[in-house]
Amino acid sequence: MGILYQASDPMVWAIWLFVVFALMAFNEFGRTSVWGGVALFAVAPIVFTIFVWPNTAAPGNEYGTGNWFNWVKTYSALAGCVGFMALRFVKWRGADGREHHLYEKRWALCFPPLILAINICEAVIRDVQMFGYGLWGGAVVDHVWMISGPWNIMNAIAGVLNIITICGWFGIFISKDKSRDMIWPDMLWMWIIAYDLWNFAYTYNCMSDHSTYTGLALLIACTVPTFFTKRGAWLQHRAQTLALYAMFAMALPQFYTFAEIPTTHNPTAFFAVSLVALAANGVLAVYQFRRIRARGLNPLKDEIYNDTEKYREVVEENR
Protein backbone atom coordinates (compact mmCIF):
# COMPACT_ATOMS: atom_id res chain seq x y z
CA MET A 1 0.00 0.00 0.00
CA GLY A 2 2.93 2.31 -0.70
CA ILE A 3 0.74 4.62 -2.76
CA LEU A 4 -1.53 5.54 0.15
CA TYR A 5 0.42 4.46 3.26
CA GLN A 6 4.08 4.17 4.19
CA ALA A 7 4.10 1.72 7.11
CA SER A 8 6.04 -1.45 6.36
CA ASP A 9 6.27 -3.04 9.82
CA PRO A 10 4.20 -6.27 9.75
CA MET A 11 3.44 -5.89 13.46
CA VAL A 12 1.59 -2.62 12.85
CA TRP A 13 -0.60 -4.30 10.25
CA ALA A 14 -1.14 -7.26 12.60
CA ILE A 15 -2.47 -4.82 15.22
CA TRP A 16 -4.70 -3.27 12.56
CA LEU A 17 -6.09 -6.70 11.65
CA PHE A 18 -6.77 -7.44 15.31
CA VAL A 19 -8.75 -4.20 15.59
CA VAL A 20 -10.87 -5.20 12.58
CA PHE A 21 -11.75 -8.59 14.04
CA ALA A 22 -12.33 -7.14 17.52
CA LEU A 23 -14.80 -4.63 16.09
CA MET A 24 -16.67 -7.36 14.25
CA ALA A 25 -16.73 -9.57 17.35
CA PHE A 26 -18.07 -6.86 19.67
CA ASN A 27 -20.56 -5.79 17.02
CA GLU A 28 -21.84 -9.35 16.86
CA PHE A 29 -22.09 -9.49 20.65
CA GLY A 30 -24.06 -6.25 20.74
CA ARG A 31 -26.24 -7.39 17.85
CA THR A 32 -27.21 -10.84 19.11
CA SER A 33 -27.59 -10.02 22.81
CA VAL A 34 -30.03 -7.42 24.10
CA TRP A 35 -28.14 -7.04 27.34
CA GLY A 36 -24.87 -6.97 25.45
CA GLY A 37 -26.18 -4.05 23.42
CA VAL A 38 -27.38 -2.23 26.53
CA ALA A 39 -24.01 -2.73 28.24
CA LEU A 40 -21.96 -1.58 25.25
CA PHE A 41 -24.06 1.32 23.99
CA ALA A 42 -25.87 2.64 27.07
CA VAL A 43 -24.08 1.70 30.30
CA ALA A 44 -20.46 1.94 29.10
CA PRO A 45 -20.89 5.43 27.55
CA ILE A 46 -22.37 6.79 30.79
CA VAL A 47 -19.43 5.43 32.78
CA PHE A 48 -16.90 6.78 30.26
CA THR A 49 -18.60 10.19 30.12
CA ILE A 50 -18.39 10.62 33.89
CA PHE A 51 -15.10 8.96 34.79
CA VAL A 52 -12.88 8.54 31.71
CA TRP A 53 -13.35 10.88 28.74
CA PRO A 54 -13.06 14.17 30.68
CA ASN A 55 -9.43 13.15 31.30
CA THR A 56 -8.48 11.17 28.19
CA ALA A 57 -10.30 13.34 25.62
CA ALA A 58 -9.99 16.79 27.14
CA PRO A 59 -9.82 19.68 24.65
CA GLY A 60 -6.26 20.31 23.47
CA ASN A 61 -4.85 17.01 24.73
CA GLU A 62 -1.57 15.80 23.24
CA TYR A 63 -3.21 13.00 21.24
CA GLY A 64 -5.66 15.13 19.27
CA THR A 65 -8.82 13.39 20.51
CA GLY A 66 -10.24 16.44 22.28
CA ASN A 67 -11.59 18.28 19.22
CA TRP A 68 -15.29 18.96 18.69
CA PHE A 69 -15.60 16.42 15.91
CA ASN A 70 -14.55 13.41 18.00
CA TRP A 71 -17.02 14.29 20.75
CA VAL A 72 -19.90 14.94 18.35
CA LYS A 73 -19.18 11.83 16.27
CA THR A 74 -19.04 9.60 19.34
CA TYR A 75 -22.38 10.74 20.72
CA SER A 76 -24.14 10.78 17.35
CA ALA A 77 -23.03 7.19 16.74
CA LEU A 78 -24.23 6.20 20.21
CA ALA A 79 -27.54 7.99 19.58
CA GLY A 80 -27.94 5.86 16.49
CA CYS A 81 -27.22 2.65 18.40
CA VAL A 82 -29.72 3.47 21.16
CA GLY A 83 -32.34 4.64 18.67
CA PHE A 84 -32.01 1.50 16.59
CA MET A 85 -32.32 -0.65 19.71
CA ALA A 86 -35.53 1.20 20.54
CA LEU A 87 -36.89 0.44 17.08
CA ARG A 88 -35.95 -3.20 17.50
CA PHE A 89 -37.20 -3.86 21.01
CA VAL A 90 -39.63 -1.19 22.30
CA LYS A 91 -43.21 -2.47 22.44
CA TRP A 92 -46.36 -1.81 24.44
CA ARG A 93 -49.92 -2.99 24.81
CA GLY A 94 -52.41 -0.46 23.49
CA ALA A 95 -55.94 0.39 24.54
CA ASP A 96 -57.16 -2.10 21.95
CA GLY A 97 -55.48 -4.89 23.91
CA ARG A 98 -53.02 -5.59 21.10
CA GLU A 99 -49.23 -5.49 21.25
CA HIS A 100 -47.70 -2.58 19.34
CA HIS A 101 -44.10 -2.00 18.26
CA LEU A 102 -42.23 1.25 17.78
CA TYR A 103 -41.06 0.26 14.29
CA GLU A 104 -44.70 0.14 13.16
CA LYS A 105 -44.91 3.93 13.48
CA ARG A 106 -43.94 5.70 10.26
CA TRP A 107 -42.55 8.68 12.15
CA ALA A 108 -40.18 6.35 14.00
CA LEU A 109 -38.83 5.04 10.69
CA CYS A 110 -37.63 8.56 9.89
CA PHE A 111 -35.01 8.29 12.64
CA PRO A 112 -32.53 5.98 10.81
CA PRO A 113 -32.18 8.16 7.69
CA LEU A 114 -32.11 11.31 9.82
CA ILE A 115 -29.28 10.17 12.10
CA LEU A 116 -27.40 8.80 9.08
CA ALA A 117 -27.73 12.09 7.21
CA ILE A 118 -26.60 14.02 10.30
CA ASN A 119 -23.60 11.72 10.64
CA ILE A 120 -22.58 12.29 7.02
CA CYS A 121 -23.21 16.03 7.32
CA GLU A 122 -20.82 16.24 10.28
CA ALA A 123 -18.07 14.83 8.08
CA VAL A 124 -18.96 17.12 5.16
CA ILE A 125 -18.61 20.13 7.48
CA ARG A 126 -15.24 18.83 8.68
CA ASP A 127 -13.98 18.46 5.09
CA VAL A 128 -15.02 22.03 4.30
CA GLN A 129 -13.43 23.21 7.54
CA MET A 130 -10.19 21.47 6.57
CA PHE A 131 -10.20 23.27 3.23
CA GLY A 132 -10.76 26.54 5.07
CA TYR A 133 -7.61 26.02 7.13
CA GLY A 134 -5.61 26.67 3.95
CA LEU A 135 -2.90 24.14 4.77
CA TRP A 136 -1.73 23.90 1.17
CA GLY A 137 1.69 22.53 2.13
CA GLY A 138 0.50 20.36 5.01
CA ALA A 139 0.65 20.98 8.76
CA VAL A 140 -0.26 19.41 12.08
CA VAL A 141 -3.84 20.09 13.25
CA ASP A 142 -5.14 18.62 16.51
CA HIS A 143 -1.86 16.67 16.66
CA VAL A 144 -2.55 14.94 13.33
CA TRP A 145 -0.85 15.80 10.03
CA MET A 146 -3.30 17.37 7.54
CA ILE A 147 -3.17 18.98 4.12
CA SER A 148 -5.83 21.16 2.51
CA GLY A 149 -6.70 21.02 -1.17
CA PRO A 150 -9.46 20.70 -3.77
CA TRP A 151 -10.01 17.14 -2.59
CA ASN A 152 -11.78 18.51 0.49
CA ILE A 153 -14.42 20.23 -1.64
CA MET A 154 -14.67 17.27 -4.03
CA ASN A 155 -15.35 14.91 -1.17
CA ALA A 156 -17.76 17.30 0.52
CA ILE A 157 -19.81 17.24 -2.70
CA ALA A 158 -19.61 13.43 -2.70
CA GLY A 159 -20.96 13.43 0.86
CA VAL A 160 -23.89 15.64 -0.12
CA LEU A 161 -24.69 13.29 -3.01
CA ASN A 162 -24.52 10.38 -0.59
CA ILE A 163 -27.11 12.06 1.63
CA ILE A 164 -29.37 12.80 -1.35
CA THR A 165 -29.31 9.15 -2.43
CA ILE A 166 -30.48 7.78 0.94
CA CYS A 167 -33.75 6.08 0.06
CA GLY A 168 -36.49 3.61 0.99
CA TRP A 169 -36.59 4.13 4.76
CA PHE A 170 -40.31 3.44 5.02
CA GLY A 171 -39.48 -0.13 4.01
CA ILE A 172 -37.42 -0.70 7.17
CA PHE A 173 -38.60 -3.67 9.25
CA ILE A 174 -37.36 -5.86 12.10
CA SER A 175 -36.04 -9.34 11.34
CA LYS A 176 -38.03 -12.36 12.47
CA ASP A 177 -35.10 -14.10 14.19
CA LYS A 178 -33.98 -13.87 17.80
CA SER A 179 -31.57 -10.97 17.23
CA ARG A 180 -34.40 -8.77 15.85
CA ASP A 181 -32.11 -6.76 13.57
CA MET A 182 -33.14 -3.52 11.89
CA ILE A 183 -33.39 -4.42 8.21
CA TRP A 184 -33.28 -1.76 5.50
CA PRO A 185 -33.74 -3.73 2.24
CA ASP A 186 -33.60 -0.70 -0.07
CA MET A 187 -30.07 0.09 1.13
CA LEU A 188 -28.35 -2.15 -1.41
CA TRP A 189 -24.70 -2.71 -2.26
CA MET A 190 -24.50 0.25 -4.68
CA TRP A 191 -25.18 2.79 -1.96
CA ILE A 192 -23.02 0.98 0.59
CA ILE A 193 -19.98 0.93 -1.71
CA ALA A 194 -20.51 4.60 -2.63
CA TYR A 195 -20.69 5.43 1.09
CA ASP A 196 -17.55 3.42 1.84
CA LEU A 197 -15.58 5.22 -0.86
CA TRP A 198 -16.80 8.62 0.35
CA ASN A 199 -16.15 7.85 4.01
CA PHE A 200 -12.68 6.50 3.36
CA ALA A 201 -11.85 9.64 1.38
CA TYR A 202 -13.16 11.73 4.28
CA THR A 203 -10.98 9.95 6.84
CA TYR A 204 -7.99 10.12 4.51
CA ASN A 205 -8.53 13.87 4.09
CA CYS A 206 -9.36 14.79 7.67
CA MET A 207 -7.78 12.10 9.85
CA SER A 208 -4.87 11.28 7.54
CA ASP A 209 -2.42 9.20 9.60
CA HIS A 210 -5.28 7.67 11.61
CA SER A 211 -7.33 6.72 8.55
CA THR A 212 -6.34 3.06 8.41
CA TYR A 213 -8.35 2.67 11.62
CA THR A 214 -11.04 5.36 11.36
CA GLY A 215 -11.48 4.57 7.67
CA LEU A 216 -10.34 1.15 6.45
CA ALA A 217 -10.80 -0.86 9.64
CA LEU A 218 -14.20 0.61 10.50
CA LEU A 219 -15.56 0.26 6.98
CA ILE A 220 -14.41 -3.34 6.64
CA ALA A 221 -15.82 -4.16 10.09
CA CYS A 222 -19.33 -3.07 9.08
CA THR A 223 -19.32 -3.99 5.38
CA VAL A 224 -18.19 -7.61 5.77
CA PRO A 225 -21.07 -8.50 8.17
CA THR A 226 -23.48 -6.77 5.80
CA PHE A 227 -22.57 -9.09 2.94
CA PHE A 228 -21.77 -12.29 4.83
CA THR A 229 -23.34 -12.32 8.32
CA LYS A 230 -26.57 -10.33 8.37
CA ARG A 231 -27.63 -8.85 5.07
CA GLY A 232 -29.82 -5.77 5.13
CA ALA A 233 -28.55 -4.55 8.49
CA TRP A 234 -25.72 -2.31 7.24
CA LEU A 235 -26.74 0.81 9.16
CA GLN A 236 -26.99 -1.14 12.40
CA HIS A 237 -23.53 -2.65 11.79
CA ARG A 238 -22.14 0.77 10.90
CA ALA A 239 -23.51 2.57 13.96
CA GLN A 240 -22.31 -0.11 16.37
CA THR A 241 -18.79 -0.48 14.98
CA LEU A 242 -18.39 3.31 14.74
CA ALA A 243 -19.57 3.80 18.33
CA LEU A 244 -17.30 1.03 19.59
CA TYR A 245 -14.21 2.45 17.94
CA ALA A 246 -15.04 6.04 18.88
CA MET A 247 -15.38 5.06 22.54
CA PHE A 248 -12.12 3.12 22.40
CA ALA A 249 -10.21 5.98 20.74
CA MET A 250 -11.57 8.51 23.23
CA ALA A 251 -10.66 6.30 26.19
CA LEU A 252 -7.23 5.17 24.97
CA PRO A 253 -5.82 7.89 22.71
CA GLN A 254 -2.27 6.62 23.35
CA PHE A 255 -3.08 3.79 20.94
CA TYR A 256 -2.01 5.92 17.99
CA THR A 257 1.46 6.51 19.42
CA PHE A 258 2.49 2.90 18.83
CA ALA A 259 0.09 1.64 16.16
CA GLU A 260 -0.23 4.61 13.81
CA ILE A 261 0.05 3.91 10.09
CA PRO A 262 1.04 7.18 8.38
CA THR A 263 -0.10 8.16 4.92
CA THR A 264 2.42 8.99 2.20
CA HIS A 265 1.46 12.68 2.54
CA ASN A 266 1.26 12.76 -1.25
CA PRO A 267 -1.24 15.35 -2.60
CA THR A 268 -1.83 13.16 -5.66
CA ALA A 269 -3.08 10.35 -3.40
CA PHE A 270 -5.48 12.72 -1.63
CA PHE A 271 -6.82 13.95 -4.97
CA ALA A 272 -7.21 10.44 -6.40
CA VAL A 273 -9.06 9.07 -3.36
CA SER A 274 -11.56 11.94 -3.37
CA LEU A 275 -11.97 11.77 -7.14
CA VAL A 276 -12.97 8.10 -6.93
CA ALA A 277 -15.44 8.91 -4.14
CA LEU A 278 -16.97 11.79 -6.10
CA ALA A 279 -17.23 9.72 -9.28
CA ALA A 280 -18.88 6.79 -7.49
CA ASN A 281 -21.45 8.96 -5.76
CA GLY A 282 -22.10 10.93 -8.94
CA VAL A 283 -22.78 7.75 -10.88
CA LEU A 284 -25.06 6.47 -8.11
CA ALA A 285 -27.01 9.74 -8.03
CA VAL A 286 -27.55 9.71 -11.80
CA TYR A 287 -28.54 6.03 -11.81
CA GLN A 288 -30.95 6.48 -8.93
CA PHE A 289 -32.51 9.60 -10.45
CA ARG A 290 -33.12 7.70 -13.69
CA ARG A 291 -34.80 4.84 -11.80
CA ILE A 292 -37.00 7.26 -9.89
CA ARG A 293 -38.03 9.04 -13.06
CA ALA A 294 -38.59 5.86 -15.08
CA ARG A 295 -40.77 4.28 -12.38
CA GLY A 296 -42.58 7.47 -11.37
CA LEU A 297 -41.50 7.19 -7.73
CA ASN A 298 -41.48 9.63 -4.84
CA PRO A 299 -38.00 9.29 -3.26
CA LEU A 300 -39.32 10.58 0.08
CA LYS A 301 -41.96 7.87 0.33
CA ASP A 302 -41.24 5.00 -2.04
CA GLU A 303 -38.64 2.25 -2.11
CA ILE A 304 -36.41 2.60 -5.16
CA TYR A 305 -35.09 -0.95 -5.56
CA ASN A 306 -38.00 -3.14 -4.46
CA ASP A 307 -38.23 -4.63 -7.95
CA THR A 308 -34.68 -6.06 -7.81
CA GLU A 309 -33.57 -9.58 -6.97
CA LYS A 310 -31.16 -8.42 -4.23
CA TYR A 311 -33.97 -6.53 -2.50
CA ARG A 312 -36.22 -9.59 -2.58
CA GLU A 313 -33.44 -11.82 -1.21
CA VAL A 314 -32.94 -9.56 1.82
CA VAL A 315 -36.68 -9.47 2.52
CA GLU A 316 -37.07 -13.25 2.17
CA GLU A 317 -34.16 -13.91 4.54
CA ASN A 318 -35.47 -11.68 7.30
CA ARG A 319 -39.24 -11.34 7.15
Language-model-detected regions and their locations in the chain:
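An N-terminal, globular interaction/scaffold subdomain
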Residues: 2-97
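Membrane-interface segments at the starts/ends of alpha-helical transmembrane spans
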Residues: 1, 59-68, 136-152, 261-273
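Generic multipass alpha-helical transmembrane bundles of integral membrane proteins
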Residues: 99-232
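C-terminal ends of transmembrane helices
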Residues: 20-32, 82-100, 167-178, 224-232, ...
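Central hydrophobic cores of alpha-helical transmembrane segments
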Residues: 37-44, 111-115, 191, 238-250
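Membrane-helix interface motif
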Residues: 53-59, 121-139, 254-262
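Hydrophobic cores of alpha-helical transmembrane segments in multi-pass inner/ER membrane proteins
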Residues: 13-22, 73-91, 155-170, 218-223, ...
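C-terminal transmembrane-bundle signature of multipass membrane proteins
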Residues: 17-24, 214-318
